[in-house]
């Protein structure tokens, strides 16, 4: 038995998820902690997702702040649990993705794991994606192997859907290797559009989207992006799907009500997921949803409408809190690294072979 911490900061940049887990024969979630992202740090990280001046210094300063925030959250969680740093074997830190371009041979996550190890007194495992990219893979998604470990006993033909900033599927079938890929935008465009139009960080329960009407012309234009035509392995990020991308499409179409654009973006998220699933897996028994999208009632309802033959439910219905699956995954990835266990899946990322992921920063 060993304790691990997983730290996850996704493309939504809303905050840091920290999970304390116990790794034995099975993985058990013991405690969680959430720290909101300071608005100025969020803006700095968002700015680093596209080209700009003085990027190296800006990235270095931002990752120091990210590590300091993560360190503070870890100290708070350990204090609440009455644990000393030496009780934890390692921290699995995803860091913050600022660029992801595997076709050009690189992916960049920042978070200064050396500083995080120094601040916490706990060994840190980080930089999980680059080894897979070095082996010719997409570097994403990395969670399908964890989903397989966590959920494979629940059925013969399952799909695990993570909806964060982007959506990705893990396809689990008995006696077959796990498959997985990114489907497209999850919450990233929904969040960006409502933030620009109303100043809200996200569309609570999808209520604003539900007040609008999806526009077929806009949806067709968005779905014509080449990314959606490809089959997995594939991954994507803010480099492709962002507000300028949406604005370019809107500029060529009639003016729409803002809520109708939001409704169309929700339909884009739902359709890209179900279309991707239909291409890759037939006879899906259940679609289990985790990530922020599991809390979006309008999205969950639409997924159920588009996939009537399967059970569509939050992972919470199966005893796994949907908000903490990814943080748990990076705790598990740290365990795999320290034990020398390969944690990528070539059937997911198209890497040349199995690889041990992560770099170790001793306490």
From Swiss-Prot:
In this chain, ATP is annotated as bound at: 10-17
Q: Which InterPro entries match?
A: Anhydro_N_Ac-Mur_kinase, ATPase_NBD
Tell me which species this is from: Pseudomonas putida (strain ATCC 47054 / DSM 6125 / CFBP 8728 / NCIMB 11950 / KT2440)
- Protein name as annotated: Anhydro-N-acetylmuramic acid kinase
Protein family per UniProt? Belongs to the anhydro-N-acetylmuramic acid kinase family.
Relate the protein's function as given in its record. Catalyzes the specific phosphorylation of 1,6-anhydro-N-acetylmuramic acid (anhMurNAc) with the simultaneous cleavage of the 1,6-anhydro ring, generating MurNAc-6-P. Is required for the utilization of anhMurNAc either imported from the medium or derived from its own cell wall murein, and thus plays a role in cell wall recycling. Contributes to intrinsic fosfomycin resistance in P.putida.
What start-end ranges are recorded for coiled-coil regions in this protein? none
Q: In which pathway does it act?
A: Amino-sugar metabolism; 1,6-anhydro-N-acetylmuramate degradation; Cell wall biogenesis; peptidoglycan recycling
Q: Pfam families, alphabetically?
A: AnmK
Query: Among its keywords, does the record have Cytoplasm?
Result: no
Please indicate if the UniProt record lists Transferase as a keyword. yes
Known EC number: 2.7.1.170
Among the record's GO biological process terms, what is one? response to antibiotic
What keyword terms does UniProt attach to this protein? Antibiotic resistance, ATP-binding, Carbohydrate metabolism, Kinase, Nucleotide-binding, Transferase
What range does the record give for the signal peptide?
none
If you read the UniProt record, what top EC class would you report for this enzyme, in one word?
transferase
Q: Which reaction does it catalyse?
A: 1,6-anhydro-N-acetyl-beta-muramate + ATP + H2O = N-acetyl-D-muramate 6-phosphate + ADP + H(+)
A GO MF label: phosphotransferase activity, alcohol group as acceptor
Q: What happens when the gene is disrupted?
A: Cells lacking this gene accumulate anhMurNAc and are fosfomycin sensitive, in contrast to wild-type P.putida, which is resistant to fosfomycin.
């Amino acid at each position: 038995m060993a304790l691990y911490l997983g730290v996850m900061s996704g493309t939504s940049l809303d905050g840091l998820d920290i999970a304390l887990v116990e790794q034995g024969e099975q993985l058990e979630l013991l405690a969680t902690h959430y720290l909101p992202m300071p608005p100025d740090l969020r803006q700095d990280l968002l700015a680093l997702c596209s080209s700009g001046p003085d990027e190296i210094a800006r990235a270095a300063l931002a990752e120091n702040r990210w590590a300091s925030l993560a360190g503070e959250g870890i100290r708070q969680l350990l204090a609440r649990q009455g644990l000393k740093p030496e009780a934890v074997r390692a921290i699995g830190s995803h860091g913050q993705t600022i660029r992801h371009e595997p076709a050009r041979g690189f992916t960049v996550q920042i978070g200064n794991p050396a500083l995080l190890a120094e601040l916490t007194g706990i060994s840190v495992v980080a930089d999980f994606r680059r080894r897979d990219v070095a082996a010719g893979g997409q570097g994403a998604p990395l969670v399908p192997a964890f989903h397989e470990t966590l959920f494979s006993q629940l059925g013969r033909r399952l799909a695990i859907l993570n909806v964060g900033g982007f959506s990705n599927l893990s396809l689990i079938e008995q006696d077959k290797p796990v498959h997985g890929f990114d489907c497209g935008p999850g919450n990233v465009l929904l969040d960006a559009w409502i933030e620009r139009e109303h100043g809200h960080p996200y569309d609570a329960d999808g209520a604003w989207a539900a007040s609008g009407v999806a526009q077929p012309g806009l949806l067709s234009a968005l779905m014509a992006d080449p990314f959606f035509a490809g089959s997995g392995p594939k991954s994507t990020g803010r480099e492709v799907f962002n507000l300028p991308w949406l604005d370019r499409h809107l500029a060529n179409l009639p003016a729409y009500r803002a809520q109708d654009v939001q409704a169309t973006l929700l339909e884009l998220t739902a359709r890209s997921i179900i279309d991707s699933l239909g291409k890759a897996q037939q006879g899906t028994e259940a679609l289990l949803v985790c990530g922020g999208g599991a809390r979006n009632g309008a999205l969950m309802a639409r997924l159920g409408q588009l996939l009537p033959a399967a059970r569509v439910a939050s992972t919470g219905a199966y005893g796994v809190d949907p908000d903490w699956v990814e943080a748990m995954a990076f705790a598990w990835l740290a365990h795999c690294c320290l034990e020398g266990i390969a944690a990528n899946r070539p059937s997911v990322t198209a890497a040349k072979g199995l690889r041990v992921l992560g770099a170790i920063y001793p306490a």
